[in-house]
């Protein structure tokens, strides 16, 4: 989990320009990290590329926090 979290954190920091300390498993992309809908779509696409997974639109709608993303990747990568 730590390796996946590290990669996800780096992508979020690079994409959203937030401080690494704000990226926690409980952090909401929109509410805590200031992402808008387009940011979330771009994050999902980048996660797909980085981890070689395909995240359906339905699944993407359920990925609201950093922890959700990490759990999804671990279960599907």
UniProtKB/Swiss-Prot annotation:
Q: Which UniProt keywords apply?
A: Cytoplasm, Fatty acid biosynthesis, Fatty acid metabolism, Lipid biosynthesis, Lipid metabolism, Phosphopantetheine, Phosphoprotein
**Per its UniProt entry, which superkingdom is the organism in?**
Bacteria
* Localization per Swiss-Prot or TrEMBL: Cytoplasm
The record's listing under Gene3D superfamilies reads: ACP-like
Q: Which Gene Ontology terms of cellular component type are present?
A: cytosol; membrane
The GO terms describing molecular function are: acyl binding; acyl carrier activity
Among the record's GO biological process terms, what is one? Answer: lipid A biosynthetic process
Q: What is its main location?
A: cytoplasm
Protein modification: 4'-phosphopantetheine is transferred from CoA to a specific serine of apo-ACP by AcpS. This modification is essential for activity because fatty acids are bound in thioester linkage to the sulfhydryl of the prosthetic group.
| Domain (Carrier) ranges | 2-77
Pathway assignment: Lipid metabolism; fatty acid biosynthesis
Which HAMAP family would you find in this protein's record? Acyl_carrier
Which family does the record claim for this protein?
Answer: Belongs to the acyl carrier protein (ACP) family.
Tell me the NCBIfam families matching this sequence: acyl_carrier (TIGR00517), PRK00982.1-2 (NF002148), PRK00982.1-4 (NF002150), PRK00982.1-5 (NF002151)
Protein name, entry field: Acyl carrier protein
What organism does this protein naturally occur in?
Answer: Listeria monocytogenes serovar 1/2a (strain ATCC BAA-679 / EGD-e)
């Amino acid at each position: 989990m730590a390796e996946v979290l590290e990669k996800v954190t780096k992508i979020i920091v690079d994409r959203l320009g937030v401080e690494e300390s704000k990226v926690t498993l409980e952090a909401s992309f929109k509410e805590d990290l200031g992402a808008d809908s387009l940011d979330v779509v771009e994050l999902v696409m980048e996660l797909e590329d980085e981890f070689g997974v395909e995240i359906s639109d339905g699944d993407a709608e359920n990925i609201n926090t950093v922890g959700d993303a990490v759990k999804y990747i671990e279960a599907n990568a």
